[in-house]
């Protein structure tokens, strides 16, 4: 399931050359690049190249349809769109769109943009320079673009690195590269020297094979992916003694799934709660959690994160009472792109209103109690009935 590998030196050079090509096309600091590409090497190269120019990258999940691509493109008004021919439908005609190959070969990745041997001027350090836009799942209607700058990505790196997946080892991204779980974390993963296994199309048997073959210490993804791995016919053909943790987010994990995963992989299961707006950082069950915490809660705030449950008047409620979950974390988005009114309603006095209902139990763990809307979750993404 793996394509030709590319080393860090080559990745740096290729993204340098593509950055110069992007600059010749008019991308500059503050420009917006929209990627409607598979989760492969061209996506990664384009993201790095844009960042080297100070441009902002927004990604479209390949699973979305044409009408959804239309909404996302209109949300961010990109200066340039890169798309493969199977993922271009719905991109408005008035935008500048380039069709590119989805080839994962280093020699072919965005070849039309490469300026051999050239590199862009290095930008001065600026913690407030925007880097990426991650689209929300549309739990209250149309998706919104959550903007993240260097400051937030550095905070995420500080909070997220090490732990369950260590540093400098092998990792399989559990989401599409356009998802907040990848876009806000690729930076620290690359800086740590991680070997990333990029999968255009996630398949349980492929992931199980990679985990076994490369002795990958952490299983990551959403609950539905874990269920597919447990049910895959090839599961018992593999040795998973290497697995030290199962780290799952993007939606609830049923107790029966947690129990089965812990038993079959022989590893602890950390259920994570976060949101696009929080940068994928929030609450987590401990790897050494007792059954009550592991099976029925989303744990406690991770280091560096504050959490509160408040009523409709924004006042903290007593333990055991249900209210809206608020988070305070340096990883939270800068704003919603082009939506100051909703930003002001969501980011309040340094806190992020999640729109999720929760209560705190007698162990200090948080238990979710639904949302204030009627969306449902599919593979880590909220799905709007419309």
Question: Model-found features: residue ranges?
Answer:
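Conserved AMP-binding/adenylate-forming core of the ANL superfamily
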Residues: 1-40, 44, 48, 65-70
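Conserved AMP-binding A3 loop
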Residues: 5-9, 131-155
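Conserved structural elements of the adenylate-forming
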Residues: 12-20, 127, 146-167, 174, ...
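ANL superfamily adenylate-forming
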Residues: 86-127, 154, 233
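Conserved pre-ATP/AMP-binding loop-to-beta segment of ANL
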Residues: 114-135, 142, 164-170, 305
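Conserved AMP-binding/adenylation subdomain of ANL enzymes
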Residues: 154-170, 178-218, 232
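Gly/Ser/Thr-rich phosphate-binding loop
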Residues: 191, 216-220, 230-292, 306, ...
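Conserved ATP-binding/catalytic segment of the ANL
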Residues: 316-320, 324-386
């Amino acid at each position: 399931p793996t394509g030709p590998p590319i080393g860090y030196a080559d990745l740096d050079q290729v993204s340098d050359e593509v950055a110069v090509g992007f600059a010749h096309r008019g991308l500059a600091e503050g420009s917006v690049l929209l990627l409607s590409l598979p989760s492969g090497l061209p996506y990664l190269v384009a993201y790095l190249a844009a960042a080297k120019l100070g441009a902002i990258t927004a990604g479209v999940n390949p699973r979305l349809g044409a009408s959804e691509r239309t909404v996302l493109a209109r949300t961010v008004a990109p200066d340039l769109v890169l798309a493969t021919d199977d993922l271009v439908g719905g991109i408005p005609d008035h935008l500048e769109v380039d069709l590119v190959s989805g080839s994962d070969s280093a020699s072919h990745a965005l070849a039309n943009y490469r300026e051999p041997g050239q590199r862009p001027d290095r930008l001065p350090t600026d913690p407030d320079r925007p880097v990426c836009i991650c689209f929300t799942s549309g739990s209250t209607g149309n998706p919104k673009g959550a903007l993240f700058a260097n400051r937030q990505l550095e905070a995420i790196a500080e909070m997220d690195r090490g732990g369950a997946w260590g540093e400098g080892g092998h990792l399989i991204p559990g989401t599409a590269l356009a998802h907040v779980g990848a876009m806000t974390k690729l930076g620290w993963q690359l800086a740590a020297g991680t070997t990333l296994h990029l999968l255009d199309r996630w398949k349980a048997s492929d992931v199980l094979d990679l985990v076994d073959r490369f002795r990958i210490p952490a299983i990551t993804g959403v609950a539905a992916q874990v269920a597919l791995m447990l049910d895959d016919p090839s599961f018992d053909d593999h040795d998973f003694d290497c697995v030290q943790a199962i780290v799952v987010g993007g939606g609830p994990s049923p107790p029966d799934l947690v129990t089965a995963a812990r038993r079959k992989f022989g590893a602890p299961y950390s259920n994570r709660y976060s949101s696009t707006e929080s940068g994928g950082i929030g609450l987590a069950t401990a790897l050494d959690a007792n059954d009550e915490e592991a099976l029925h809660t989303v744990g406690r705030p991770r280091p560096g994160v504050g959490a509160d449950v408040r009523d409709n008047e924004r006042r903290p409620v007593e333990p055991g009472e249900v209210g809206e979950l608020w988070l305070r974390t340096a990883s939270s988005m800068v704003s919603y792109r082009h939506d100051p009114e909703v930003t002001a309603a969501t980011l309040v006095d340094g806190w992020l209103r999640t729109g999720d209902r929760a209560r705190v139990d007698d162990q200090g763990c948080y238990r979710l109690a639904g949302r204030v809307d009627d969306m449902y979750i599919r593979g880590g993404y909220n799905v709007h009935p419309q």
